[in-house]
């Protein structure tokens, strides 16, 4: 049996109940227009539906929400390996006012289970990326590198106003990253454009420092998307769009030796890739025990390359 779950001029999504359903990656692709869910098409009539019964089909979902308004598109997300429903889906109303009707109804039950509809793209103000700054994040320093080594190297590019390394209070050893502040943002631009620099025989990564209010939502969504990837069988760019609705996962998804560390960044800054910068990374010396090794097969995610200090465990040593 073939059930058509879309109407109107938009693309039609079709699920087959007696044969393997549409691959989860393809279903997800129809719902993801950007890599982080904050740009691209944000249909005001679109809703995320969580808490679905494993037996709920796209047709059942469409029939239920059809009482609130004409449904333009509807889908239930499935695991591409097992073909089982993953307990959540999406609907898009023709008239965005139908979303308010759904939200005004406090309780929703479908197939004997309470479900949780939410606005797929909630309105929120996001801090803008800082592109002009004199402060640069330096990551991947060798254990033998000193504050003086870092300062001397970057002084070859311009005057250094401030330099600091972040130290572990318990071991009194630096954690492999720090910050350099130049006397002009032009020098910082040049350093970040080169991106990788060699200090004491080890490649280090330079990124423009960003206010933590910029990095916090990015990091949270990236971390949750990375954790959920295997469970939901979706590519990261899709999960990022809906990461705020997915279950929270335990464990530390950032760099080794770092925990919840958004609270005490010096000056409220962290590192973030420069927009439009090259993503080509040269052969480097980041092994699995290094600062840049992640627990997801060694894949380096740009936003997870940001360093934050734990309020109780880390402090800085400054040259000035």
Curated annotation (Swiss-Prot):
Protein keywords: Cytoplasm, Phosphoprotein, Repeat, RNA-binding
RRM domain ranges (all copies): 45-124, 134-211
GO function terms (MF aspect): mRNA binding
Effect of residue 19 to D: Increases short term memory retention in response to repeated exposure to diacetyl, a chemical repellent. No changes in long term memory retention in response to repeated exposure to diacetyl, a chemical repellent
Phenotypic effect of disruption: RNAi-mediated knockdown increases short term memory retention in response to repeated exposure to diacetyl, a chemical repellent.
PTM sites of type Phosphoserine: 19, 34
Residues carrying Phosphothreonine: 18
Compositionally biased spans, kind Basic and acidic residues: 23-38
Tissue specificity comment: Expressed in the gut and in AVA, AFD, RMD, RMED, RMEV, RMER and RMEL neurons (at protein level). In the tail expressed in neurons and all the ray sensilla. Expressed in male specific C1-C4 neurons.
Range of residues in the leader sequence: none
GO BP annotation list: nervous system process; regulation of translation
Result when mutating residue 34 to D: No changes in short term memory retention in response to repeated exposure to diacetyl, a chemical repellent
InterPro entries, sorted: MSI_RRM2, Nucleotide-bd_a/b_plait_sf, RBD_domain_sf, RRM_dom
Biased composition (Low complexity): 1-14
Keyword 4Fe-4S among record annotations: no
PROSITE patterns, per the entry: RRM (PS50102)
Subcellular location: Cytoplasm; Perikaryon
Phosphoprotein as UniProt keyword: yes
Membership in a protein family: Belongs to the Musashi family.
Role, per record: RNA binding protein that regulates the expression of target mRNAs at the translation level. Binds RNA containing the 5'-[GA]U(1-3)AGU-3' motif located in the 3' UTR of the target mRNA. Binds to the mRNA of three Arp2/3 complex components arx-1, arx-2 and arx-3 and negatively regulates their translation during association learning. Plays a role in time-dependent memory loss and the retention of conditioned behavior over time, probably through negative regulation of the Arp2/3 actin cytoskeleton branching complex and regulation of synapse size.
Protein name per the record: RNA-binding protein Musashi homolog 1
Originating organism: Caenorhabditis elegans
């Amino acid at each position: 049996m073939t059930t058509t779950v879309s109407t109107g001029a938009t693309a039609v999504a079709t699920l087959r109940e007696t044969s393997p359903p549409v691959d989860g990656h393809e279903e997800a692709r129809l719902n993801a227009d950007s890599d982080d869910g904050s740009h691209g098409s944000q249909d005001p009539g679109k809703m995320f539906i969580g808490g679905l019964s494993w037996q709920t089909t796209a047709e059942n979902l469409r029939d239920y929400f059809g009482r609130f308004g004409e449904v333009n598109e509807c889908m239930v997300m499935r695991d591409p390996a097992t073909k089982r429903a993953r307990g959540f889906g999406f609907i898009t109303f023709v008239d965005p006012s139908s979303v308010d009707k759904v939200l005004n109804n406090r309780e929703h039950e479908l197939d004997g289970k309470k479900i949780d509809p939410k606005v797929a793209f909630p309105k929120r103000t996001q801090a803008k990326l800082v592109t002009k700054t004199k402060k640069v994040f330096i990551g991947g320093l060798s254990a033998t590198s000193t504050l003086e080594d870092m300062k001397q190297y970057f002084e070859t590019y311009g005057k250094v106003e401030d330099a600091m390394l972040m130290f572990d209070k318990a071991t009194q050893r630096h954690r492999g990253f720090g910050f350099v502040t130049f006397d002009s943002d032009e020098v910082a631009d040049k350093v970040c454009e080169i991106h990788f620099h060699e200090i004491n025989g080890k490649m280090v990564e330079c990124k423009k420092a960003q206010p933590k209010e910029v990095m916090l939502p990015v990091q949270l969504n990236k971390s949750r998307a990375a954790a959920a990837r295997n469970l939901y069988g979706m590519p990261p760019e899709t999960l990022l769009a809906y990461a705020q609705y997915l279950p929270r996962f335990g464990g530390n998804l950032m760099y080794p030796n770092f925990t919840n560390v958004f609270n005490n960044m010096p000056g409220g800054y962290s590192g973030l890739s420069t927009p439009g910068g090259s993503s080509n990374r040269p052969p480097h010396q980041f092994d699995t025990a290094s600062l840049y090794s992640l627990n997801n097969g060694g894949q380096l995610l740009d936003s997870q390359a940001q360093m934050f200090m734990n309020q109780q465990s880390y402090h800085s040593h400054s040259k000035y």
